[in-house]
Amino acid sequence: MKLSLLAAAAIAPMVSAHYFFDTLVIDGQETTPNQYVRSNTRPEKYNPTKWVNTRDDMTPDMPDFRCNKGSFTFAGQTDTAEVKAGSKLAMKLGVGATMQHPGPGLVYMSKAPGAANQYEGDGDWFKIHEEGICDTSKDIKTDAWCTWDKDRIEFTIPADLPDGEYLIRSEHIGVHGAHDGQAEFYYECAQVKVTGGGNGNPQDTIKFPGGYQKDDPSFNFSVWGGMKDYPMPGPAVYTGGSGSSTGSYNESNAEDSNEYPYQKESGTCQSNFYRREHARDFSHRRA
């Protein structure tokens, strides 16, 4: 569903505070808003999903946490974009918004058993991209984060991903209130058909809902009190040999480490997280 100019104008004052993804970018070319990205039925489309002080009675423990409230009702009228394995994509925010909350950006994919426009996203999800803190010399409350003031999350489709139709779930998590249990989730799903892929087999997966828990360290993080490491949520990034490099880490180190992921290099948004804390079972599946 496309927003009218009047509705967009009404939303514009809120864009720095709340936002939503509505545009798929394919190899640098922007598509039409909601052409390939499912819309939602929230009264204010930019409202976040939270566990505390909820909006629209939505929490991360509900099935609509997959692609946002009521999004499956738009699946049939949303086109499916054909994209090549290994291609560079982005999910862009609507109405000129930028991400002006501190927090990470993540991208997940889930293979549909058939057509993407008939898939509710109740299968397994694997992560293909993550980005957190880019520059430890900057303010953790604002511009230390890779996503700060950007209008999109950029990522690469793993080159060995099997052909077929998928949902792509882009997500930004605002952690400015996470110290009080009020992490904010902004997310939507695009429908794509991957071609020219390979025989990759992502094993490290989660489900939505269930993959995120209210007591996860990722969602109870404090940006107050100075710079600190951020514990990325979810499973390891599946790169398939040439997926998004931002957010990858060495899993052999992670399994034996009690440390949070940390930034290998500062001053760049190519953030290579190669340690993570396993504070609990993240409800993701390993082979």
Swiss-Prot record:
CDD domains: LPMO_AA9. O2 binds at residue 176. It catalyses: [(1->4)-beta-D-glucosyl]n+m + reduced acceptor + O2 = 4-dehydro-beta-D-glucosyl-[(1->4)-beta-D-glucosyl]n-1 + [(1->4)-beta-D-glucosyl]m + acceptor + H2O. Its EC number is 1.14.99.56. Its cofactor is Cu(2+). Keywords: Carbohydrate metabolism, Cellulose degradation, Copper, Disulfide bond, Glycoprotein, Metal-binding, Monooxygenase, Oxidoreductase, Polysaccharide degradation, Secreted, Signal. InterPro entries: AA9 (IPR049892), AA9_LPMO (IPR005103). Disulfide bonds join 67-189. Glycans are attached at residues 220, 250. Residues 274-287 have a biased composition (Basic and acidic residues). Cu(2+) binds at residues 18, 186. Pfam families: AA9. This is AA9 family lytic polysaccharide monooxygenase D.
